[in-house]
Amino acid sequence: MKISQIWTTGYAAGMNKMVDYLTHYYFRDKEPFMSLSALADHEAIKIMEALCDDTPFGTRFKDPLQYLRNRRATETWVREGFAAKGGQPQAPYPISMVLGSSKWMVAIAPDRDRHAEIRIPLSIFSETDISFTVPDSMISRWFSLEKPPEFYQPELHGQIFTLSEILAIVDQKGMPELDWQTNLPSDLAPYIEAQVWRHDLLKVYKKGNDYGSG
């Protein structure tokens, strides 16, 4: 089922906080839709060592090997959870994006001059192409394992959501950075993460395409 069909059924027909796009954030001088998960360990570690700093963006890379292990374990968890709900992940790893947009992502950009973004319409995806977590998938999995009492919400954390499920949550609660009462520390991502499992659908939105690029 594509989003155009979802809008005409059930909850979505009366949705008043409609969000109909994803945002991919990347460095302007780099190719979009790239992933550390596509690289050999030594290549990924080299990149993380170069990006490591004390900002919310770079601090996660202070132990690059452990980060890579956690990332791959998280991607496997999301992939298996999505498949269990009927998803059809066609790639071994997802391209991560944000549902709607994120002021937090813009604010933590380590180099504003290199910051760029591409908006992808949700209408190109079906239910079997894309999964979601609240918030970032690594944080969601971490919360579900550690269950920190000040942050853990079992109905949201440790859950893999389909397109229709996440839109139902947005219809009920609004968008996290605008409408939710959250006590997440400022260094943790507050957005809804989207995991795109069909990379071929993104080719038309690469550099040189005028749609939604920033």
Protein language model features and the residues they cover:
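N-terminal amphipathic/basic-hydrophobic helices that include classical n-h-c signal peptides
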Residues: 1-14
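Short alpha-helical segments and helix-capping/turn motifs at coil-helix boundaries
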Residues: 7-10, 81, 101-106
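Conserved NAD+-utilizing ADP-ribose enzyme module
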Residues: 16-21, 28-61, 91-93, 102-214
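Short, intrinsically disordered low-complexity segments
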Residues: 57-95, 99
